[in-house]
Amino acid sequence: MGGVGHTVLVVDDDDSLRMLCRVNLELEGYRVLEAPTVERAEELLRGENVDVVLLDVHVGSGDGFKVLAELNDERVALFTGSFEVDAQRSAEVDAVLRKPFTLTDLSETVGRLAAREAGGSRFR
């Protein structure tokens, strides 16, 4: 199981999407945390050792980029649907997962990011 020992935080206001990510990533051995709001994401990042963040651009009434601006060293994949990620924003993240994405895309992206050397949550 490639995910053993790695923690993934899924930040999205879509309950079904978070559940889909959680179930599939847990089957691969990842520990998965879920945040339906920017505030919950910030709380989890302060209290948990997170390796990979899957971050929706628009999280409810919050702004996913607000969380992105607070991250120090987590590996980040940005979720986006109709929103076009400009070159500057793309440079701030490690990967972009365009909705709808396949489970293979999810698995490969998280696996690639989790395999990188990094030191867990560095939330400011």
Residue ranges and their predicted role:
Residues 1-9, 102-124:
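Non-catalytic signal-transmission and effector/linker regions of two-component phosphorelay proteins
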